[in-house]
Every structure is written in structure tokens, then in C-alpha cells.
Amino acid sequence: MKLYSINTGHFKLDGGAMFGVVPKSIWNKLNPADENNMCSWALRCLLVEDEGKLILVDNGMGNKQDEKFFGHYYLHGDDTLDKSLAKHGFGKDDITDVFLTHLHFDHCGGSIIKEGDKLVPAFKNATYWSNERHWKWATEPNAREKASFLKENILPIAESGQLKFFNVNGQSSGVSLDAANTNALPSHDSCLTTHDSHLISNLSFYSVSGHTDAMMLPKINYKGRTIVYMADLLPSAAHIPLPYVMAYDMFPLTTLNEKKAFLTEAHENDYVLFFEHDPLIECCTLQQTEKGIRQNEVFKLREL
């Protein structure tokens, strides 16, 4: 097996939204904001080469949205998906599978490209993987989350015939958060469960539902270590402390429970955490401190 970090650029999000109830006087020391209160975040994907497959985990924001859209998110940096793939000797046509942790625009925007007036898969030889629960959540979005689920990123995947679903068992949230149901929020318990991907023998995944329903976190056995792609359960190393939960999360108390369960397991088993959005830290391990579980060693994926 070979693993490659695939950087697709950086973007900006409001620091308050990214750190939730944590005061700016604290989080601003971790990721300093600009004059508009915006912090810079990475769009870091993962490429897995194993058993004759080339699996891309997430694919960034893409480039098909208009200037106004990108103006909201300040896409910046020299890295692109194409450049980063080429750096390792690959192109989009080499990708056999695209593993979508979830369908927010900054994770799946590179799935679809424009060819003239048509929207077509960027990875023409690949199978795109989601799960039925999350697909339904994304294609029938609640009003709070709707702006993150862009139809042009999602629907053409199904229309292409290249979409398949992983089997994610367990109880769904069972709720629509539209205006008619705002008083019907459920008790949303922790859903940290592990599933076999059946793609390659060394790849399984967690499903978690605090950030969005049935998000998937790849769990990879590599060189005797376990690497977990954190997606938006822990978007950065700064989010390791339990109260550091994004305001974007649909069910923050569920996130809190999922983080606690995951961090305990990860610390006990010396997992390597791979961060999708940390602007500086690619990977870290964990240690127990007086304040709880915190980051320990920090390193690049290629150093493993």
C-alpha cells in the first residue's frame, strides 16, 4: 500500500463558526483570523494505492462555481487537485474509486466538472462512494444545511451511473429539519460505528452523525499503524479538545460524544490522525494530559 497527501488549496471560513462556543481570545491563538474574522483552512485529500485500486478520499471545492461563490470563501494557494495528483504521477483518469466522506461542497466539489454547458464526472473511470442515509440527507436538505449541499456537485454523480453506496447500518436521525419540523428534533445519540468498506482489505470506516448525518471517516491499516482520515469530526488538531465543536455541526452534543469515544480509542491504540482542514498540521498522534487527550507528535504522512 502507498498513501499520498493530496493538497487542493486553501480556503477561508469564519473563525467563530469553526470554533463554536470557544471564545475568540482563545481560538485566535490557534488559527489567527484576518480583518474579516476569517481563518485559513486546508483542503487536504488522501490518495490510497492498494490491491490494484487508486482510491481518492474527498476532492476539495473544485473550480466550476462562479466568481461570487469563490469570493465568499477566498480560495487561495498554488495547490490544485490536478497538480497534486500529477506530482505523484497520476491523473484523474487513473482514479478507480472516489470515497466521499460527506457531500458538503468543500469535500465533494471536485467530483463534477463543467464541459461546455454539461456537468460531468471529473473521474470518468471511477466509482463514487457515499451511503444511502447521507445521500438522502444531502438531496433532501434541511434549511440550515442546504447551502452546503450544492445540487450541481451531487445530482450529476447519480445521473452518471457511477454512484454506489456503502452499507451503513444503524438508526438514522429520522428527522427533517425544515421549517415544519423545527420542534421535532430527536435525541441524537452517538453513532460511532465501524464498517467494512469491501473495497480493499486494509480500508474500513467509521460512520458519525454529529456534523452531518452518516459522515464516513476512512480507517486505514498502513505499515503496522492505523490512520484515520478525520474529515469534519476533527477538522484540525486545534479541534481535539472536547468543547471545540464547530457551529456548523447539526448535532453538537452528538459530535461531543463521538469525539470522546474516538479520542479514547485512538489514544489507547496509538492511531495516526490525518487532518483534512488543518492549515499546518497534516498528521498527529495523541497523548493523555491533565487537561484530557491532546495532540502529541506532529508529522507529515510521508514520514511514516
Task: Label the model's feature ranges.
Residues 55-57, 99, 128, 227-229, ...:
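Residue-level marker for buried hydrophobic side chains located in beta-strands
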Residues 62-63, 73, 76-79, 84-90, 94-106, 122-187, ...:
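Metallo-beta-lactamase
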